[in-house]
Amino acid sequence: QTQASLHALEQFSSSYDLTDGLGLAILMPKWMKYLLDRDETVIDDFARFGVNVMGVEENEDKKAVAYQAIEALQCFIKDELGLPVHLSELGIDDSRFEKMKVKACYGQESLPRAYRPLTQEDCFNIYKMCL
């Protein structure tokens, strides 16, 4: 089983001529939020990331800690690294998202062997969050 679904999702670099790192910086917080909104099994991982990596204060409400982790990551990317956090900041629209979702899933209906399974529709929705 692979956990590289985030890298599979990162189609911005080939579709819009962005660097892979910038694409991942825009994508990762949205991917995390998308998963957290739909799959409570990610709460512990994302909360642990928040505490251990982003310096979020640990408390009993792990879901709140997980959301704080995502916010802290997005703020770090924008404020500390000075990178855009939305595709619209780069003048990018959604005109290529349909093709990107197919490429992200390697032409299949979904990425079942990902950290968490993602369908093409999931990929499309995450891309929309990046606008």
Positions of the model-derived regions?
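Short acidic alpha-helix initiation/capping motifs at coil-to-helix transition points
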Residues: 3-4, 74-82, 100-106
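Flexible, glycine/charged-enriched surface loops at secondary-structure junctions
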Residues: 1-5, 59-63, 83-90, 112-120
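Gly/Pro-rich interdomain helix-loop hinge
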Residues: 12-96
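Short, amphipathic C-terminal "tail helix"
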Residues: 93-131
